Curated annotation (Swiss-Prot):
This is Methionine aminopeptidase 2. Belongs to the peptidase M24A family. Methionine aminopeptidase eukaryotic type 2 subfamily. Cotranslationally removes the N-terminal methionine from nascent proteins. The N-terminal methionine is often cleaved when the second residue in the primary sequence is small and uncharged (Met-Ala-, Cys, Gly, Pro, Ser, Thr, or Val). Binds 2 divalent metal cations per subunit. Has a high-affinity and a low affinity metal-binding site. The true nature of the physiological cofactor is under debate. The enzyme is active with cobalt, zinc, manganese or divalent iron ions. Most likely, methionine aminopeptidases function as mononuclear Fe(2+)-metalloproteases under physiological conditions, and the catalytically relevant metal-binding site has been assigned to the histidine-containing high-affinity site. It comes from Ajellomyces capsulatus (strain H143) (Darling's disease fungus). Residues 1-66 are annotated as: Disordered. A divalent metal cation 2 binds at D224, H293, E326, E421.
């Protein structure tokens, strides 16, 4: 989920060309292949003894539980040990990563490092595995003719089923589930669009460029990952540019990495691509006013940003940081404006409620705190809980700065925007691209 800069035949995700491979210690684990294990030959007496032995009955409790299609089996029932697979583990390069943390500025991150324990990693890996299984299924059903409301429902139903938290009981959605509303953005709509109740149905077309951006959390540990799909091959270079730019950002990310260097490198890679549309060659441009971002506990947007264009910031990545490395490339002006409508809402826990007088607003705020906390939510999520006549209360919360509203972000009409995104954990001795999968 992109952070807006302050002050203002079919193509699957894995079909675009890849950048040079990252040096991985442990690539994403694959499903184990079944096969026969051949032993050594034994004597006839051993064979006779074996025949006499009774065959052991299969313990049905130990039978492997497989995921369904669509995915609806909770991961806790598949991973009985409750230990979830590692993602892509990448060694730090010695060029820009100082593993000796000695400066006073970094001491403030000790509490973050102490929290990066086995439980932290397992929650993140759990959320990442949910994301992988859900997205790999929806990639098989994304075709021209599908309604975007149906696609959002498939994603969100899958996430809630696999986390085993439907979010209908008070506080249940805070344990695990959707980290923010599913983003389904077509063509020049870059980010922050989701189907809303009562809106006109949107049907996916052959010539559309669709960005799918959704987040999964387990105990507030948020995995934010996005990909783009297009059916018309004329967009291949656009998707390749953005995917390679994102992978470049992931390659450059690390402890002590300068954000300015990462941003400049991302832009250089992305803007080396061109696309030909309607017999006109158009350069792919890095979007200027939306950024990648760090992720905090229960907060999708932290206090650090990773632009996709050259910047003068002196900020560095630090040990213990969690970043959503994402890039957006456009065939338009590569500058986004707010469109009409509301994508979602987010509660600001630091805002004062002193000026809040409407009883409807107070009641709504209580519901928001109990069910979403600081996680971003949409109107669909409120109505799913049975909340009615909330518009006046929501208007009061937004006006008083207690809840922030997010509008869709768009480039100029007729342009096309693509997005790819992964979440990366900057662990003390390696970085883990937690959302990496076989698809992208």
């Amino acid at each position: 989920m992109g952070s807006k800069t302050p002050g203002n035949h079919r193509r699957d995700p894995n079909e675009s060309s890849r950048p040079p491979a990252i040096d991985a210690i442990n690539p994403p684990k694959q499903a184990a292949a079944s096969g026969l294990v051949h032993g050594s030959l034994e004597g006839e007496s051993q064979k006779r003894n074996k025949r006499k032995k009774k065959k052991k009955k299969k313990n049905t409790k130990e039978l492997e539980i497989l995921q369904t299609t669509p995915p609806r089996v909770a991961l806790a029932n598949i991973f009985r040990s409750q230990r979830y697979p590692e993602a892509e583990i990448v060694k730090y390069s010695s060029d820009n990563d100082n593993l000796q943390r000695t400066t006073a500025e970094e001491l403030r991150h000790l509490s973050v490092l102490n929290a990066m324990d086995d439980e932290f990693l397992n929650d993140y890996r759990n959320a990442a595995e949910v994301h992988r299984q859900v997205r790999q299924y929806v990639q098989t059903i994304i075709k021209p003719g599908i309604a975007l409301s149906q696609l959002a429902q498939e994603i969100e139903d899958g996430v809630r089923a696999l986390t085993n938290h439907q979010g209908l009981e008070t506080g249940d959605a805070l344990k695990a589930g959707m980290a923010f509303p599913t983003g389904l953005c077509l063509n020049n709509i870059a980010a922050h669009w989701t189907p809303n109740p009562g809106a006109k149905e949107v049907i996916l077309q052959y010539d559309d460029v669709l960005k799918i951006d959704f987040g999964v959390h387990v105990n507030g540990r948020i995995v934010d990952s996005a990909f783009t799909m297009a059916f018309n091959p004329v967009y291949d270079n656009l998707l390749a540019a953005v995917k390679n730019a994102t992978n470049t950002g992931l390659k450059e990310a690390g402890i002590d990495a300068r954000i300015a260097h990462i941003s400049e490198t991302i832009q250089e890679v992305m803007e080396s691509y061109e696309v030909e549309l309607n017999r006109k060659v158009i350069p792919v441009k890095a979007v200027r006013n939306i950024t990648g971002h760090n992720i905090l506990h229960y907060k999708i947007h932290g206090d650090k940003q990773v632009p996709f264009v050259k910047t003068q910031t002196n900020q560095r990545m630090e040990e213990g940081d969690v970043f959503a490395i994402e890039t957006f490339g456009s065939t338009g002006k590569a500058y986004l404006d707010d469109a009409t409508g509301i994508y979602g809402y987010g509660y600001d826990e630091n805002a004062s409620t002193a000026g809040l007088h409407h009883s409807s607003a107070k009641s709504l705020l209580k519901t928001i705190k109990e069910n979403f906390g600081t996680l971003v939510f949409s109107r669909r999520y409120l109505e799913r809980l049975g909340v009615q006549r909330y518009h006046l209360g929501m208007r009061s919360l937004v006006t008083n700065g207690i809840v922030q509203s997010y509008a869709p972000l768009v480039d100029v009409p007729g342009s096309y925007v693509a997005q790819f995104e992964h979440t990366v954990l900057l662990r003390p001795n390696c970085k883990e691209v937690i959302s990496r999968g076989d698809d992208y």
